[in-house]
C-alpha cells in the first residue's frame, strides 16, 4: 500500500495511525535516502541535499525491501537521520501473511510501476490537504525536529509550497489517486485481510 503526496501532507501520521490500529508494518521510504557523502546525491540551489529530487534515494533498494517483507515476512532496513543526512542504524520489520504493508514517502508514487509488475501493489494513494495548511505543518515539524537551520527551512518551505501542484500531478500520473488523510484512513480501515500472493 503506497502512500505518497507532498511533504507535510500527513503521510507519516496516517501510516502510524493505521499501523497502530491494524498492526500493519510501515516502511519509511525516507530511510532509503542517499547519505551526505554519496557523490550521486543531488544538491539544491541553496547548497543542501535536494531531498525532493528523484535521484536522492535508492528506489531499487526500496522495492527489494518491500518484496522481501511481503514474500518472506521479514526484512532489515536502514534508519536514516535527515538532520545528519546519514544512516544511523538498522531495524528489522516483520509482516504477517495477511498484513498490508504501508510504504510512505514523497517518492512512493514512483514505485507504482515496479511493484505492480511484481504483483505486489494493493493501492497507491496521494495524501493531500490544503497546501497552505500543509506548508505550515511541514515547517512546524521540520523546526521541531531540527532538520535544518530555520532560514533554510523557510526557503525550502516556500519552494515546496510553489511546487506542490506539480508533485500532486506527478503522483497522479504514476497512478496514485488523491485523497484526504481522514478519507484514506476510513477507506483503508475497511479493507479485508490481504490475500496471499500467488507464486511468482
Residue ranges of predicted features:
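The conserved Walker
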Residues: 7
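Conserved lysine of the Walker
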Residues: 11
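Hydrophobic anchor at the beta1->P-loop junction of P-loop NTPases
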Residues: 3
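Conserved nucleotide-sensing/catalytic segment adjacent to the nucleotide-binding pocket
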Residues: 25-26, 34, 39-85
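NTP-dependent small-molecule kinase module
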Residues: 96-97, 140, 159-200
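Post-Walker A helix-loop "phosphate-sensing" segment adjacent to the P-loop in P-loop NTPases
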Residues: 20-30
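ATP-dependent NMP and nucleoside kinases share a basic, alpha-helical "lid"
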Residues: 88-147
Amino acid at each position: 500500500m503506497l502512500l505518497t503526496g507532498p511533504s507535510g501532507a500527513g503521510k507519516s501520521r496516517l501510516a502510524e495511525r493505521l499501523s497502530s490500529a491494524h498492526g500493519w508494518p510501515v516502511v519509511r521510504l525516507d530511510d532509503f535516502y542517499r547519505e551526505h557523502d554519496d557523490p550521486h546525491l543531488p544538491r539544491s540551489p541553496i547548497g543542501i541535499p535536494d531531498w525532493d529530487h528523484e535521484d536522492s534515494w535508492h528506489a531499487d533498494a526500496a522495492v527489494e525491501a518491500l518484496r522481501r517483507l511481503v514474500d518472506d515476512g521479514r526484512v532489515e532496513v536502514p534508519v536514516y537521520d535527515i538532520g545528519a543526512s546519514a544512516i544511523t542504524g538498522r531495524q528489522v520489520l516483520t509482516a504477517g501473511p495477511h498484513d498490508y504493508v504501508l510504504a510512505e514517502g514523497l517518492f512512493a508514487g514512483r514505485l507504482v510501476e515496479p511493484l505492480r509488475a511484481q504483483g505486489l501493489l494493493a493501492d497507491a494513494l496521494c495524501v493531500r490537504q490544503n497546501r497552505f495548511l500543509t506548508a505550515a505543518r511541514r515547517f512546524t515539524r521540520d523546526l521541531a525536529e531540527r532538520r535544518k537551520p530555520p532560514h533554510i527551512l523557510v526557503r525550502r518551505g516556500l519552494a515546496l509550497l510553489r511546487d506542490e501542484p506539480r508533485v500532486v500531478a506527478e503522483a497522479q500520473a504514476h497512478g496514485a489517486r488523491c485523497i484526504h488523510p481522514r478519507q484514506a484512513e476510513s477507506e483503508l480501515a475497511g479493507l479485508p485481510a490481504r490475500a496471499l500472493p500467488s507464486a511468482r
